[in-house]
Design a protein with these regions (language model features):
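Multi-pass alpha-helical transmembrane bundle typical of ion/small-solute transporters
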Residues: 1-303
């Protein structure tokens, strides 16, 4: 049963990481076209290793260790497989802080897309919210106030976690907002390939935070996150190399990724307040939502 649960979790992580990184793959492909062959190969090899082992391995491990410093670096890596009751108790007591922070980040990310970002409209209601963009900051401010108010009743550290999650959103959003402008500059062949590689690494790191935080809705196991998100990152690199134009044809994949992010963020916030949600729920929610928008994209392409 544990093996089946781990398999479903990893499969969900791979799918979520792949689809949520499509925008990143498109930026990578556009910039790589302006680089020399040697620089492209360097980025696709060493950049991938950095993305897989550092961002999707070290970052979730560092987050778990920061949230539960008492268990130490080794137990932070293997905590979910540990039989030590002290380690399991420490994880259980501290996980709400991680869950509420990551959940707040993801919910903010969804509402920013819903209210402010240009999109292919996959659902009729998206037209309404796109016309109300001015309300984005009011909505997330009220939402954060509500989450913090409820969290303070349980644990002040949970409230602090929610604030950290919202701060992380606005910091990473600043990097993403600058990405399009910087991409236009980097398309100029006069800039060095080293500058372009450094830019791509920064952008990849920024985009990866969504996937890393979303992964905690599936599991707190760092090895499973590394495996699932790592394979997803490799798939994204392959898409960058050979299939980016085909992926662009699936116009509603981004919609699916964002609704999945809403689902995962909501699960994390609810779970942080002590409502037990089975581990299989996050993968199933991801499969169903992404499957729906994949089919919708397929039908739109044929039509």
């Amino acid at each position: 049963m544990l093996l089946l649960s781990s398999f479903i979790t990893v499969a969900g992580l791979i799918l979520f990481e792949t689809v949520s990184s499509v925008d990143n793959a498109i930026i990578n492909a556009e910039v790589l076209r302006t680089m020399q062959e040697k620089a492209r190969r360097w980025f696709l090899l060493w950049g991938m290793l950095f993305a897989v082992f550092f961002i999707r391995g070290v970052l979730p491990w560092a987050i778990v260790w920061a949230v539960v410093p008492a268990i130490g670096p080794i137990d932070a890596l293997t905590a979910t497989f540990s039989s030590d009751p002290k380690v399991l108790q420490a994880i259980e007591q501290s996980s709400p802080v991680l869950l509420i922070g990551g959940g707040t980040f993801l919910v903010f990310l969804f509402f920013h897309w819903l209210f402010l970002e240009p999109k292919n409209y996959g659902l009729k209601i998206e037209h309404f919210f796109a016309a109300q963009g001015v309300w984005f900051y009011a909505v997330v401010s009220v939402l954060l106030t509500l989450i913090v108010w409820l969290a303070l009743k349980r644990d002040p550290m949970m409230a602090f976690g929610a604030v950290i999650g919202s701060s992380a959103f606005f910091i990473t959003h600043g990097f993403k907002q600058n990405a399009e402008e910087q991409e236009r500059k980097l398309m100029d062949r006069g800039m060095s390939d080293i500058s372009k590689i450094l830019y791509l690494e920064v952008i990849d790191t920024t985009f990866s935070i969504d996937g890393v935080l979303g992964a905690f809705a599936f599991t707190l196991s760092v090895p499973l996150i590394l495996l699932g998100n790592g394979i997803g990152a490799i798939v994204v690199r392959q898409i960058t190399i050979s299939n980016i134009e085909n992926i662009k044809k699936y116009i509603y994949l981004k919609n699916g990724a964002m609704y999945s992010i809403l689902g995962l963020g909501s699960i994390m916030v609810i779970d942080s307040f002590g409502v037990h949600i089975p581990e299989w729920v996050s993968p199933v929610v991801t499969f169903v939502i992404l499957g729906y928008f994949f089919v919708k994209s397929k039908l739109a392409h044929k039509g």
